């Protein structure tokens, strides 16, 4: 067998065949696209030795901090730190969050070596405060290392990556928790069926999604995690989101029709992933993962930053006992004339996770504040995002999540002009529930069409007026005024004047209200690709606008992204 060089810590009885070394052209490959295709196709998956050499090559190419512990550092410190204690007695650092070490295909020497390496990493990386993926990462790489020191160096390089555009491993609770929120955002957009199931069977859906990294680094069988890691080393963190979304889709497909209890959902998903080889091959998992038309890496990074900012503003930067802050709609303090507590909780599961940390705050209702746009603007300006709810005289219920402060309408003077972001969506609750998101989410090719005309409202020229470098612009998904939005009719989110309010545009309007907020109309529009949300012309019975009250500071206004 050609794998003895990297087989010291491997229990070959557990390993599914070492295989003979394949073509080694990957070791000299410098073209990123070629390397990406090789990784996705499992070019080095059948040879233990080749995979080990590829891992060494890819990890050595990671840009790192100037002072990064290497193999010689490990040899110097391991005796002093571990001493004569048996490896099995070494306590794991708190930052791994009581995560068990997956044994994968390690022999007894390898299992002990993982504890020694983690202990030394804890000594050399005092800035790590939360890294539950570390035990799995060390155990995995040890299969492809000649000795403990080499494994230590490779893990250290991954942890010490200093490329700002290359996120690899979360090392703080803030980064970890914001990743969970980002995964929740992505699940709500790209796995609507599975997400709906999670909302229905769990009291706190983000508590379920907080396990998303564990599904990969901990529960996935060895033959699967290695295929994922092959691609991860080439393409980075976004791959993990893809794979976790694919796992959620497969769980929904296989288990969706079976009864589930809310307190067992996390365990059910863990067991499903652990036994994935019973229903899904590694190739099928990756095929499903890369079939998801996900946001760009830049857009996901911006969403992650927005979630981190929201957590920081609420003081959630270290692990604490979860107080169900993500289930913000409480029966005892929520009262609406339009929706029930359950319906509001369903709506809350659709909104971006960083706002779901907040509690609903009633800003405006026509029953109390009067039927006029001036009163509407008076009570809603200064708040973003907002949730608009409408009940018609025919008892139909619909609404919209609006990402941007209504005061933004003034930036174009008296001209009726669209603004807002790709996080806006419209929905109906009665007679049946349906949500319509930005059309670009399901058809990202529309987002690559730049507006060619000069009349794309205030947004088209604002970045030039503000002197913003186009290379630094935010994504259209999060930006409200820094970005030349894609195809005009696909980016008409919200507009308002003294005469009317429009939500969604392009060959129709998802919602239109007159200046007295008495009558409205709804139709298909290009921005949300929606069906009419209720009767196409309707009379408003009740209209409510809800803001988002910060749980910590009790401040209902959220500032816009910079």
Swiss-Prot record:
Subcellular location: Cell membrane; Cytoplasm; Cytoplasmic vesicle membrane; Presynapse
Principal location class: membrane
Keyword annotations: Cell membrane, Cell projection, Cytoplasm, Cytoplasmic vesicle, GTPase activation, Membrane, Synapse
UniProt cross-references to PROSITE patterns, sorted A to Z: TLDC (PS51886)
Pfam families: RabGAP-TBC, TLD
Domain TLDc: 337-549
Compositionally biased spans, kind Low complexity: 451-464
GO terms, molecular function: GTPase activator activity
Domain Rab-GAP TBC: 42-259
Region spans: Disordered: 451-471
Membrane topology field: Peripheral membrane protein
Binding residue positions for a 1,2-diacyl-sn-glycero-3-phospho-(1D-myo-inositol): 36, 40, 238, 242, 293-297
This protein's GO CC annotations: cell projection; cytoplasmic vesicle membrane; plasma membrane; presynapse
Stored InterPro entries: Rab-GAP-TBC_dom, Rab-GAP_TBC_sf, TLDc_dom
SMART domains in alphabetical order: TBC, TLDc
Self-association state and partner proteins as the record states: Interacts with ARF6.
Its biological purpose: May act as a GTPase-activating protein for Rab family protein(s). Involved in neuronal projections development, probably through a negative modulation of ARF6 function. Involved in the regulation of synaptic vesicle trafficking.
This protein's name: TBC1 domain family member 24
Source organism (scientific name): Xenopus tropicalis
This protein's encoding gene: tbc1d24
């Amino acid at each position: 067998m050609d794998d003895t060089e990297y087989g010291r810590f491997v229990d070959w009885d557990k390993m599914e065949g070492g295989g003979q070394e394949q073509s080694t052209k990957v070791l000299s490959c410098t073209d990123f696209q070629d390397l990406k295709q090789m990784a996705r196709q499992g070019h080095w998956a059948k040879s233990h030795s080749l995979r080990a050499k590829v891992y060494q090559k890819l990890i050595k190419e990671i840009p790192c901090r100037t002072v990064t512990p290497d193999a010689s550092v490990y040899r110097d410190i391991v005796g002093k730190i571990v001493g004569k204690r048996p490896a099995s007695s070494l306590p794991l650092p708190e930052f791994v969050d009581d995560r068990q070490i997956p044994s994968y295909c390690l022999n007894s020497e390898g299992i002990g070596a993982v504890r020694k390496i983690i202990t030394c990493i804890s000594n050399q990386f005092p800035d790590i405060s939360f890294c539950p993926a570390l035990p799995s990462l060390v155990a995995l790489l040890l299969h492809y290392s000649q000795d403990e020191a080499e494994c230590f160096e490779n893990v250290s390089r991954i942890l010490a990556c200093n490329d700002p555009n290359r996120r690899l491993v979360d090392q703080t609770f803030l980064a970890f928790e914001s990743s969970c929120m980002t995964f929740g955002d992505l699940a709500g957009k790209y796995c609507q069926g599975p997400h709906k199931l999670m909302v229905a069977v769990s009291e706190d859906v983000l508590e379920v999604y907080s396990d998303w990294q564990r599904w990969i680094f901990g529960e996935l069988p060895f033959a699967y995690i290695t295929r994922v890691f092959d691609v991860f080393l080439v393409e980075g963190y976004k791959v993990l989101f893809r794979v976790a979304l694919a796992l959620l889709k497969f769980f929904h497909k296989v288990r969706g029709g079976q009864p589930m209890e809310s307190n067992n959902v996390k365990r059910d998903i863990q067991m499903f992933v652990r036994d994935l080889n019973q229903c899904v091959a590694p190739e099928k998992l990756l095929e499903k993962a890369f079939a998801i038309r996900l946001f760009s890496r830049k857009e996901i990074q911006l969403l992650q930053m927005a979630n981190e900012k929201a957590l920081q503003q609420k003081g959630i930067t270290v692990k604490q006992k979860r107080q169900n802050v993500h289930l913000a709609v409480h029966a005892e303090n929520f009262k609406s004339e339009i929706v029930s507590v359950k319906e509001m909780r369903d709506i809350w599961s659709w909104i971006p996770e960083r706002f779901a940390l907040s509690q609903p705050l009633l800003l405006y209702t026509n029953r109390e504040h009067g039927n006029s746009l001036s009163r509407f603007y008076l009570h809603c300006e200064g708040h973003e995002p907002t949730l608009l709810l409408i009940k018609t005289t025919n008892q139909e219920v619909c609404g919209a999540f609006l990402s941007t402060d209504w005061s933004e309408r003034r930036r174009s003077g008296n001209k009726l002009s669209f603004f807002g972001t790709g996080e806006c969506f419209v929905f109906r609750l009665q007679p049946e529930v349906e949500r319509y998101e930005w059309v670009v989410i399901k058809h990202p090719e529309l987002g690559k069409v730049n507006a060619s005309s000069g009349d794309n409202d205030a947004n088209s020229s604002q970045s030039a007026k503000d002197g913003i470098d186009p290379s630094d612009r935010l994504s259209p998904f999060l930006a409200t005024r820094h970005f030349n939005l894609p195809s005009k009719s696909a980016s008409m989110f919200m507009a308002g004047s003294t005469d009317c309010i429009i939500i969604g545009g392009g060959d129709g309007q998802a919602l239109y209200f007159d200046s007295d907020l008495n009558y409205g109309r709804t139709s298909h529009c290009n921005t949300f690709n929606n069906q009419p949300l209720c009767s196409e012309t309707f009379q408003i019975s009740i209209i409510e606008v809800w803001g988002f009250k910060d749980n910590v500071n009790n401040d209902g206004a959220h500032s816009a992204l910079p």
